[in-house]
């Protein structure tokens, strides 16, 4: 606990809800611990694999960690992370893919280099993400360097058919890190716009005054 003074850790959950019902009864497909150095502003992200077999409640029930969110929402998911990983996380933030797409669009998109394998699959994920979020986008034309809008960045973070869950979590962290970098460099008007667009769509223990 002494070593964590000056740091703020937030559990970030990305859920597969298609109907904005993000409080529970939906799996947390993304589980990321976001550690913020309050003095320097440095942000470090650590993924928890959604299929990790852990104790999800105080009854000693072992199953995939993403089930904790399904059963008891963010509070039970945070309790499970604290219990299994010996942490003392108090804050959480839950989003669905529409909130992420909207935020990235406000920030002006992100630059990402696509491998040939990623490009092979991404357009089908773009189509699915447009249908599930109602946010417009278009297919990409090539592998290599690409400027991705919100839906395309979400599709990139969701890719999983061509490699491992580890690689998928790397893509998730990359999208979040690039978004955080743009947010830190943005002017007040853009930051305010992001907050106005995103906060009504997410579930969080954090207030705007905490940000």
Regions found by a protein language model. Give the residues of each.
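Non-catalytic, solvent-exposed segments at the cell envelope interface
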Residues: 1-211
